[in-house]
C-alpha cells in the first residue's frame, strides 16, 4: 500500500511537470511593444509560435505577414489593435453585436472582429489566406515560389488587392515593406 501511494504521488508529480513544460513550450508568446521595431518583433514571435501548427507549404511568407500586420494596425497603434486585438484588419459580417463598429460608420453592414489575443488575430488571418477562394491566386503563387525556391514578396502584394477596399493597397504594402526592411527585417 505504501509503494502504491509513492507511485501515485510520483505519477502526479510527473504529470504536473509535464503540464508545466507543455504550458511553457506551447503557450502563446507575450505580445509587448512600445515602438515599431518591437511591434514587428512581437508579430514575428507570434508567427514562429503559429507556424508550428502549419505544414511548411501552408505557412504565410513571413515578410508578407509582418508587412500586413504593420499596415493594417499601424504598428499596433490602431483602435482595433488596442481594443480588439485585431492586427490584421479583419471584418466580420455575422454576429455583428460581438465586433467593433467602424469609427464614423455606425450603419456599416460589418464590424471589425475582436480577438482574445493579438496572436489569435494573426492565426485567423493565416487561416483566411489558406482557405478562402479570394486568396487562391496567393496560394498558387506561394506554391510556385516554393517550387522555384524564390521568395518575391512584392508579387504577393498585387495578389492580395482584394484584402482591402483601398485601390492603393498594393502600393501601401510596398511602402510598409520598405519601412520594415529598413528596420532590419
Spans of model-derived segments:
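Catalytic cores of secreted/periplasmic lytic hydrolases that degrade extracellular macromolecules
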Residues: 2-67, 71-185
